[in-house]
């Protein structure tokens, strides 16, 4: 279901293998008695979506060569821009020959192809690969799969964004930094209003505000404000039934009363309806609260120094409602999968699973995240690690494309490297841990894409619903008009979506 909260998930991914024995040192396909015992070289075709910067220019990259040598394979990666990935994949599928390995980010595409029988069932072999098996919980392996079958390796996902506040503004206004035990939604509003009305930047102008957002269907910008009012993150479970946020009349009215007041009083950015990028306003020193991840907070703090020396965003727990309800929108591990084509024979399948098992092991993580010593990083004269000139020229993070864009394990150190500043790395990991302390999950993640009505009508229904939400916040409609939007959503297909989602939930709770 289209969640009103767009969790950016930034993120995150990788795939790996080790020997079926699962030891750290034996993740190799080579025999122990010379070349005569060495298994034949196997070609592995992998098709992966690429993001900003694209994939590596060819398959001669040092990490691919390392994998080829270690596992006696010929790894051929086809990088496809994310915007065109499924168009190209469907063309290839129509030809009857899928790549050996793919990453499927679309749950609906995954379910469709599972039903058509185009993927390998990995469950019979999984217990032989302990590193691989350990990257997800049993329910995450089972997600979106038929009972007693596993057609995809689940991608680990975790919350990364949290609420941040301008501490220097708090200090100037004499407001203490709120603690997790005391930070309420009312306190959030009072602080945000002070940022709007008390000239926290001291420039004598009425040009600051409490928080911002995007006036699109997701209302992206401050997702931690939904949970205090009891709104679901898409769907919630109640009394054995899944309920979508679109039918939560009382909760919507409480939330919209809060938001429309914030808009009227200038606490919410007046430009939120037309915003396309509120991040710029953080760096311009106009916003008191922000929703972002640690890495971006540090970049923003650096940018702020040019206009406000000493300015600093610091992390907070999400605010809680009157009943103690609070939450950080949390993605569900397993909705994205790495899959093997059904046409992969047993020998190639086992080699791929050996590779993946090593990939998510500590040894594999070291290579796939940090790169290769003396190529991507080296020790300096003081014994500390630093990037090589080659990696600096290529760009930090380019060495870890397989780790971030294919598959990774469930460690929260995926954005730190051997050469990262130790304090920065520790704070980064702690921030991700903090984001996971207040899980706020979508209860329908395993079932929503089983609804044909949702697949056909869900996006249009939600866009119409959220148009009313935005109009109410902006003062163009009264809060009570949300009931008409709920009625329209239900009668135009929402009731059928609820029925279909709950049928799937009842069949496989």
Annotate each PLM feature.
Residues 4-14:
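Bacterial N-terminal signal peptides
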Residues 12, 18-185, 233-235, 239, ...:
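Conserved N-terminal structural module of periplasmic/extracytoplasmic solute-binding proteins
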Residues 40-44, 71-75, 96-100, 146-151, ...:
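Loop/turn elements at helix/coil->beta-strand transitions in domains of secreted/extracellular proteins
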Residues 50-57, 171-179, 215-268, 296-332:
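Extracytoplasmic/periplasmic substrate-binding proteins
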Residues 86-98, 189-195, 277-287:
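Short helices/loops that flank or line small-molecule/ion binding pockets
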Residues 147-218, 235-281, 340-351, 357-358, ...:
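Helix-loop-helix "hinge/cap" segment bordering the ligand-binding cleft or interdomain interface
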Residues 261-264, 279-312, 318-400:
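Glycine-rich, aromatic-lined ligand/substrate-binding cores of catalytic
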Residues 354-471, 476:
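Conserved small-residue motifs centered on glycine
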């Amino acid at each position: 279901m289209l969640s009103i909260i767009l969790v950016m998930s930034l993120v995150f991914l990788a795939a790996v293998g080790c020997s079926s024995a699962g030891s750290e040192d034996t993740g190799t396909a080579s025999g122990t008695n010379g070349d005569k015992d060495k298994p034949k070289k196997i070609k592995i075709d992998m098709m992966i979506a690429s993001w900003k910067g694209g994939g590596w220019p060819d398959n001669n990259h040092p990490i691919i060569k390392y994998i080829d040598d270690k596992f006696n394979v010929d790894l051929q990666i086809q990088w496809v821009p994310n915007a065109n990935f499924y168009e190209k994949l469907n063309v290839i599928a129509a030809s009857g020959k899928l790549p050996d390995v793919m990453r499927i980010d679309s749950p609906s595409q995954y379910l469709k192809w599972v039903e058509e029988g185009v993927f390998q069932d990995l469950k019979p072999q999984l217990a032989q690969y302990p590193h691989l098996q350990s990257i997800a919980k049993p329910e995450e392996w089972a997600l979106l799969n038929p009972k007693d079958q596993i057609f995809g390796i689940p991608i680990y996902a975790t919350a990364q964004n949290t609420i941040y506040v301008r501490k220097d503004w708090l200090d100037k206004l004499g407001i203490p930094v709120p603690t997790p035990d005391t930070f309420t939604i009312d306190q959030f509003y009072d602080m945000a209003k002070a940022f709007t009305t008390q000239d926290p930047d001291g420039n004598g102008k009425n040009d600051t505000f409490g928080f911002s957002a995007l006036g699109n269907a997701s209302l992206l910008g401050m997702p931690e404000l939904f949970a205090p009012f009891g709104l679901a993150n898409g769907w919630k479970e109640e009394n054995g039934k899944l309920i979508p946020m679109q039918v939560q009349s009382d909760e919507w009215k409480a939330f919209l009363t809060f938001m429309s007041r914030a808009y009227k009083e200038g606490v919410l950015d007046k430009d939120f309806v037309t915003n396309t990028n509120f991040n710029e306003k953080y760096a311009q020193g106009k916003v008191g609260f922000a929703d972002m991840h640690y890495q971006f907070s540090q970049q923003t703090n650096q940018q702020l120094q040019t206009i406000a020396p000493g300015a600093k965003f610091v992390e907070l727990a999400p605010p809680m409602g009157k009943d103690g309800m609070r939450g950080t929108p949390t993605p569900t591990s397993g909705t994205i999968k790495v899959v093997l084509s059904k046409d992969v024979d047993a020998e190639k399948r086992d080699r791929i699973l050996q590779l993946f098992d090593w990939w998510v092991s500590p040894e594999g993580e070291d290579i796939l995240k940090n790169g290769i010593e003396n190529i991507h990083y080296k020790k300096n004269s003081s014994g500390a690690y630093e990037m090589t000139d080659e990696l600096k020229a290529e760009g930090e993070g380019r060495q870890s494309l397989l780790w971030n864009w294919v598959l990774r394990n469930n460690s929260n150190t995926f954005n730190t490297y051997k050469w990262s500043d130790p304090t920065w790395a520790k704070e980064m990991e702690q921030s991700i841990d903090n984001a996971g302390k207040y899980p706020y999950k979508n209860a329908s993640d395993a079932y929503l894409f089983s609804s044909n009505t949702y697949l056909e009508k869900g996006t249009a229904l939600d866009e119409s619903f959220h148009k009313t939400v935005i109009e109410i916040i902006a003062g163009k409609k009264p809060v009570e008009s949300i009931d008409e939007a709920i009625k329209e959503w239900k009668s135009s297909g929402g009731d059928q979506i609820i029925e279909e989602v709950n049928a799937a939930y009842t069949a496989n709770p």
